[in-house]
Swiss-Prot record:
<feature type="binding site">
    <location>
        <position position="289"/>
    </location>
    <ligand>
        <name>carbamoyl phosphate</name>
    </ligand>
</feature>
<dbReference type="InterPro" id="IPR002292">
    <property type="entry name" value="Orn/put_carbamltrans"/>
</dbReference>
<dbReference type="GO" id="GO:0016597">
    <property type="term" value="F:amino acid binding"/>
</dbReference>
<dbReference type="InterPro" id="IPR006132">
    <property type="entry name" value="Asp/Orn_carbamoyltranf_P-bd"/>
</dbReference>
<protein>
    <recommendedName>
        <fullName>Ornithine carbamoyltransferase</fullName>
        <ecNumber>2.1.3.3</ecNumber>
    </recommendedName>
</protein>
<keyword id="KW-0028">Amino-acid biosynthesis</keyword>
<feature type="binding site">
    <location>
        <position position="161"/>
    </location>
    <ligand>
        <name>L-ornithine</name>
    </ligand>
</feature>
<dbReference type="InterPro" id="IPR036901">
    <property type="entry name" value="Asp/Orn_carbamoylTrfase_sf"/>
</dbReference>
<dbReference type="InterPro" id="IPR006130">
    <property type="entry name" value="Asp/Orn_carbamoylTrfase"/>
</dbReference>
<dbReference type="Pfam" id="PF00185">
    <property type="entry name" value="OTCace"/>
</dbReference>
<dbReference type="GO" id="GO:0005737">
    <property type="term" value="C:cytoplasm"/>
</dbReference>
<comment type="similarity">
    <text>Belongs to the aspartate/ornithine carbamoyltransferase superfamily. OTCase family.</text>
</comment>
<feature type="binding site">
    <location>
        <position position="221"/>
    </location>
    <ligand>
        <name>L-ornithine</name>
    </ligand>
</feature>
<dbReference type="InterPro" id="IPR024904">
    <property type="entry name" value="OTCase_ArgI"/>
</dbReference>
<feature type="binding site">
    <location>
        <begin position="225"/>
        <end position="226"/>
    </location>
    <ligand>
        <name>L-ornithine</name>
    </ligand>
</feature>
<dbReference type="GO" id="GO:0004585">
    <property type="term" value="F:ornithine carbamoyltransferase activity"/>
</dbReference>
<keyword id="KW-0055">Arginine biosynthesis</keyword>
Length: 309
């Protein structure tokens, strides 16, 4: 039976640990220059409604590393961009490729695609969630801390799709997630409720100092995402005071780490000093998109590394 990855909660705690372990192993194999073509002869279709750097490159390189092939599909070059229904496109593509990754404006569209495709569908980003990013982030923190249970992550700024996925992950990792956002840009209530119902420990406040107190990890993202450009001035005004700078970082645990999923607008959500500082692990998490997604694809397409060793 095919398995999709539309939300971090589509996998359980044990499966998350297994994927992270596989990702670490794949990272070592790549570093050593050892072939690891666990998906030889397999194809991944990639549909991008939104522009991308990290998502496209990491999935394309990942499939190449694994011995497979990634096919880039722009909706404007497909019948999907000319009015073909999602369900029809999903059924046809599933006859050609072994999995589909979609980066779209609408989470509902990805869910509909997954309902009609009989191959695994991966959410490469939607307006609601970004589970691939959080999977890579969890791998990155696991490399630093080992067991994540009891750690506190403070999200500062716009309660966006990455923030939503972090809230949902709390039930799987045992981490406490504290969010500081202005009222208008707080995470969705239904996501907060879902995270708590799943067993997550989450809090949402308006004061950044309160959220970061004793935090082991500080996390932020750009304040103006693709599609929100018309709100730029309003967002910058509302989020003033939510910048991760050296003063805010000092309120966290002494050895707190700083994360940002990129792209960054330095001087807005994060200062250059913090971004380039010794507590920043931004580049590690960016690299780990590659390894975590490779492990995910092996799991979804081939059943995991244990199945293909």
């Amino acid at each position: 039976m095919k398995k999709d990855f539309l939300s971090i909660l589509d996998i359980g705690e044990y499966e998350l640990e297994s994927i992270v372990a596989d990702a670490v192993r794949l990272k070592r194999l790549k570093s050593a220059g050892t072939a690891h073509e666990f998906l030889r002869g397999k194809s991944l279709g990639m549909i991008f409604e939104k522009a991308s750097t990290r998502t496209r490159v990491s999935f394309e390189v990942g499939m190449s590393d694994l011995g497979g092939h990634a096919l880039f599909l722009n909706p404007q070059d497909m019948q999907l961009g000319r009015g073909e229904e999602i369900r029809d496109t999903a059924r046809v593509l599933a006859r050609y490729v072994d999995a589909v990754m979609i980066r779209a404006y609408s989470h509902a569209a990805i869910e509909e695609f997954a309902r009609y495709a009989n191959v695994p569908v991966v959410n490469g980003l939607s307006d609601r969630l970004h589970p691939c990013q959080v999977l890579a982030d969890i791998m990155t923190l696991s490399e630093r801390f080992g067991d994540l249970h009891g750690l506190k992550l403070a999200w500062v700024g716009d309660g966006n799709n990455v923030c939503n996925s972090w809230l949902l992950s709390s039930a799987l990792t045992g981490m406490e997630i504290a969010v500081a956002s202005p009222p208008r840009y707080r995470p969705r209530d239904e996501i907060v409720d879902q995270a708590r119902a799943a067993g997550g420990k989450v809090t949402v406040v308006t004061d950044p100092d309160e959220a970061v107190r004793d935090a082991d990890v500080l996390y932020t993202d750009i304040w103006v995402s693709m599609g929100d450009e018309q709100e730029r001035a309003e967002r910058l005004q509302a989020l003033k005071g939510y910048t991760i700078d050296s003063r805010l970082l000092a309120q966290a645990s002494p050895d707190a780490l700083v994360m940002h999923c990129l792209p960054a607008h330095r001087g807005e959500e994060i200062t250059d000093e913090v971004m380039e500082g010794p507590q920043s692990i931004v580049w590690d998490q960016a690299e780990n998109r590659l390894h975590a997604q490779k492990a995910l694809l092996v799991r979804l397409i081939a059943g995991g590394m244990a199945s293909v060793d």
